[in-house]
């Protein structure tokens, strides 16, 4: 699996370099779920596909920007699912964005998730790698990823990052969010899931939520290459996740590679409070 991680690092570095002079315009194409693709979405996907295709340990790849699974080496063990550029719609305002990766063994499902990674393209290039404990790495002047620290969630946080169009929220969710603000929580929502999860993780706690809404009853975030890898990282850091019903997002099973789900990530206090609010 270390070979797979090494190739992911190469792809992340190439994307980071390309971001220095990006084309932020939209293409004429849409991805499988109907999102209009930025030209840099397509370029990032091409970079990752090209790089991971050179790794003999990868059986197949699944991308947010591809309609179907792409088989690379049937004799290999690992399947890599990824969002090549999460938050790409924020490129024109120069917000921090990132890439998300899940490494599955033999079959793509949460039970077979062996490692998860995400990169942050911000003021500096950082990479979080998680097999057992999430570890933060930072690119140095020699183009090497240097270990910075292990990441761990506190029992309770102060950050409230809540997505979904508010007018379409269910009453129970609106009430839950209001109660958090009444407790003194701070709104921190950028529109890039990876950036918001990263802030909660590095600050040690809080909650990220993207609930079921009237216009998206199954949520909008994709299980295999967004929800599962970030849930894996949060839970390995001591946090909790749920879809509002299950005790963990990693209990969920889906047949379609572009399946979506409501999702909540956070410290133990916030997720326990949410489950109570959702099941009263």
Curated annotation (Swiss-Prot):
An annotated GO BP: gluconeogenesis
Subunit structure: Homotetramer.
InterPro entries, A to Z: FBPase_C_dom, FBPase_class-1, FBPase_N, FBPtase, SBPase
Cell location: Cytoplasm
Enzyme Commission number(s) of this protein: 3.1.3.11
Family membership: Belongs to the FBPase class 1 family.
Pathway annotation from the record: Carbohydrate biosynthesis; gluconeogenesis
Binding site for Mg(2+) 2: 83, 86, 226
Molecular function GO labels: fructose 1,6-bisphosphate 1-phosphatase activity; magnesium ion binding
Catalysed transformations (reactions): beta-D-fructose 1,6-bisphosphate + H2O = beta-D-fructose 6-phosphate + phosphate
Annotated substrate binding sites: 86-89, 189, 220
Amino-acid positions noted as binding Mg(2+) 1 in the UniProt annotation, renumbered to this chain: 64, 83, 85
Cofactor(s) needed by this chain: Mg(2+)
Organism in which the protein naturally occurs: Campylobacter jejuni (strain RM1221)
Comment on bound cofactor: Binds 2 magnesium ions per subunit.
GO cellular component labels: cytosol
UniProt keyword terms in alphabetical order: Carbohydrate metabolism, Cytoplasm, Hydrolase, Magnesium, Metal-binding
Protein name, UniProt field: Fructose-1,6-bisphosphatase class 1
PANTHER family xref list: FRUCTOSE-1,6-BISPHOSPHATASE-RELATED, SEDOHEPTULOSE-1,7-BISPHOSPHATASE, CHLOROPLASTIC
Pfam family, one: FBPase
